[in-house]
Amino acid sequence: MASQEHRRKAAAQTSLYILVIAAIAVVANVLGAKAYKRWDTTQAERYTLSAGSGRLIRGLNSPVQIDAYVKTGLPQLDAFVKDLTDLLKEYERAGGGKFKFTIIEPNTDELRAQAKEAGLTETPFGEANQTGEDQASITQGYMGLVLKYGSEKAVIPQIMQAEGLEFWITNKIREIRDKAENIKHRIGVVTGKDEFKLTDANLVPKQGKGGGGPTMQGIIEQAFPFYKVEEVDLKGGENAIDKDFVGLIITQPQKDYDEKELRRIDEFLMLGNKALVVYASAVTMKANDATMNATLSLHGLDKLLPGYGIKMNKDAVFDYGAQFRIGVPTQGGGFTTVRHPGIAHVVSDSRLDSENDRLLDTSFAGFFRMEEAIFPFASSLTLDKSKQPADVKVAAVARTTPATSVVTSDTVDMKLRAEWEPKPPQEQRVIAATAIGKLKSAFAGSPSDAVKVAERAPTESRILVISSSEFLTNPFAYAGNGPDLGGQFQMFGAVGGDPQLLMFAQPYTKYLTSTILSFKNTLDWMAGDADLVATSAKLIGDPALTYSDISKPKFKAGDDPAEAKKKDEEYRGARKWMQTKVQWTLTFGVPVLFAAFGLFRWQQRKSQRDQLKI
């Protein structure tokens, strides 16, 4: 009886506890209905509005209005509209009254006409039946944004996924703000040196008639029209560079700069609040040259950059610890790995994260929150902070691994091949660096009557040197694409081309998103708008596995081809074994832990019952 009485009391107490907990849950939900808080644990804060977006909105002179035209009725569409609404609410909370939005579902002829007149495009939406039957639900409607600021209007005609949406919304707001307030960001690209051009169509393999293809400048001007990229011909340094440019870009030259031209560049930087970005190295290669035979030349940049504390060395970097790899099919139906140590694949590695050996500085605007970057055909840089005043920061932002050799011969064979032989000595090399502050003139102490330059900039100027000759292009398409005939033969597009190089050019395109975002972030940095670079990180997909727990093969000087192949195979085997362990751990590990916890609780409760005194 005592036992039954005890059980009745326990059951009554349990019921009371359940009622109390349920009441607390109901009250908490009622009180928290209007409260909003979520935690974003992703590295790039993928699901949190960037602080820079909030500052942009709060800094507007008048409120921006967004009309969001949406379509609901399918589970995936409903989920997307909820995510979109949550994001717009975050903008509203961060905007300090400068952001307003309206959700509109065009379910009448009048609203549909309104959406079409605004510039939106009606889109079909489909969703497979989740019951497993061979059926799908199809609907049609509008899913886009209309932005209004002052007298200006802009449209994002179609939005299909929440990932990266903040990037496009924030940059579109910036676009209409700049247009309404007549804010211009003019970027000069130095020309007249047979240089690599941002208008070169070598991002992807050329196919069929018409050649063509996307260009770096075309992508920037179409997606981010608030940047105006203009050519600047120094013409022997006869005239000063237009002071209205926010910055200059130097791309890989084929001809040398003379001293007067370099002094004009220095004169521009000494104006203060200016930027110079150099995408060049000593490794010089010709476009459409399938031999990939490079010559080493600094083209006069060695007379300018050392004065800012960044010396470019006349060498070609070969990084055997972070070399570019690509899998290619074999005749037997398998796959083999082709390596190119002349193309450094720099990955952010927590094991090398001190100021003196960090591989990729992901706090720098150009590589902000990026897990990897590709540096084709780099030269090493030597930093000398004594060349600049103590308050000017000269720092490396990208390095190779310690397993890096350099070649200093006049010509270097960069052609793809099965085996590469490391040469001593091997050490870590700097391949990208910045100098930021009130810069001292690179020609301080050696004035010229032809170009009179201030000894020091009155305000902060910025220099970035990315010592990679083909950073802004696809190196395999650059070498493998056939030349455009031009003139009366233009209709035939590119002719010829190297099939093997073009085969490698296609998989290389997966790295171009990071390259384009790095370039766009660098433009923001040049214009002094680096506050918005955090939004770019949300466009980058989830990074590939880096296998940081597995040591990469260490290629030593003197390794013969057989030894190098053996190390490659051991590395691939270790990666495959790691994949297998992770697979089975995820398959059986969690269920086993759950079962073990259940057994533990069962034994615990059994022990308590056995100890119960009647």
Regions found by a protein language model. Give the residues of each.
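Short, surface-exposed patches at the edges or C-terminal ends of soluble domains, predominantly
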Residues: A2-I614
